Amino acid sequence: MDYTALRPSSGGGSHGAPLFLEGVIVCWQFADLLDVTLGENLGHFDDLVVVTSHEDRQTAAVCRRHSVPCVPTDAIRGRWRDAFNKGAAINIGLGHLSHRGWLLHLDADIVLPDCFRTMLAKEWLEPECLYGADRLNVVGWDQWQKLKATAVYRRQFQYRCLVQNSGHPLGARLIHGEYGYCPIGFFQLWHGSARRRYPHNCGAAEHSDVVFALQWPGPKRRLLPQVLTYHLQSEAAPMGVDWRGRKSMPFGSSRKTR
């Protein structure tokens, strides 16, 4: 079976219904990575918005290049402009979507597998649930180029029954000591009928995603075992290095964001 050039309408939804997928990405100081990931991810969405600050002109330029709506806001920096209010930015992005189907919050450095909609079609998605996925850490421009040349990247799903790992390290899952599994912010999929909003002010990029996930009871927070995303990193860096603003190197020093 050839899983090439999937159109958004080909994905399945809850109980086999057609799936309508909208997405929101918050991108502040990550235009170099967004330029790469948008090119890989756009075909999976029926609608997608990117939220950034008014000052981040590089992100706005990337959105224009990919013909993606860009929503600038002051809220991304917080009231006193001394924080990264990612939750407020996500809420603003969600306000630009219809919520008539499924919603996916995705980080700017995440690439979805090219068989993503096919894999969603193999899941009995329940509108009452929040779904997370795993990520494979791809460190550096050279590793990314090498990965794209492999058959595993072109088609994770092989023989109609096997999900293949590309051999890259698996990113950590969050298993909370009191609350159990929590889908974290790089990939959170939920149905628009849930009418959930992000915590408004946690001061950085971490924590708000966990608080958001805890709006669903434990049995309703689920991992999609058939979805392996790619987490692009410019360099090996400690966890949280960019949670309060970009500190890591640009992704691919020879690349320019116009």
Go through each PLM region and give its residues.
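C-terminal catalytic/acceptor-binding lobe
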Residues: M1-G11, G16, L33-T37, H176-E178, ...
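Short, well-formed alpha-helical segments that are part of the catalytic scaffolds
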Residues: C27-G43
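Active-site-proximal specificity loops/subdomain of glycosyltransferases
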Residues: T59-H96
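Short beta-strand-to-loop acidic/aromatic patch adjacent to the donor-nucleotide binding site
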Residues: R100-V111
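Conserved catalytic core of nucleotide-sugar-dependent glycosyltransferases
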Residues: P113-H200
